[in-house]
Amino acid sequence: AKELQTNYFYKYNTSLNGLMIHHNIPPQEFLKYVHTIDLSFMREDTVMRRELEQLDMEKFIFTNGSAEHAENILTHLGIYDLFGRDKVFDIEDAGYVPKPEAKTFDLMVKKFGINPKETIYIEDIAKNLSIGHKRGCTTVWLINDEHFGKMDADKDFISHKIENLSLFLKEIRLLKSQ
């Protein structure tokens, strides 16, 4: 099962996409099951909250997961109220077509009325930044050690690489105030 999951993730950008293509798996049931996880290890991130609050820019969540999963993560981090459901573009909004597909990116841009040339696109999966770069975004990869996350991390579609999101948000805020 783990091998199948990994293979589908690599080939189809999400395990769900592969399961839908090859096994007609209902996406809502899969997402509910796979996102039923213990998040008690996560703590409120007061530094990130402060930086998000002080950064005078619109902020959105663009996820290959469900909106409910994003809500759970953001709630555990203590920042959900800074976004809310209306600031989340999830896999259901994408018609279950995952990032980095152009169609999905374009739907997200349309939903939020974003101008990609005025957008900073931050991702933990490097290859997902490719379409943002093509559309004109400043792309930022949040460095991590996950094998799939760092695939394509050496490509030129990545404008910046960061290790600390809160510090990066602070740097953006300080640059904007100059």
Question: How does the language model describe each region?
Answer:
Residues 1-50, 68-71:
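N-terminal helical cap/lid subdomain that shapes the substrate entry/recognition surface
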Residues 5, 16, 38, 60, ...:
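Residues at structural and domain junctions
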Residues 28, 53, 66-67, 71-178:
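Asp-based, Mg2+/Mn2+-dependent phosphohydrolase catalytic module
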Residues 50-59:
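A short, Lys/Arg-enriched amphipathic alpha-helix followed by its capping loop at the start of a domain
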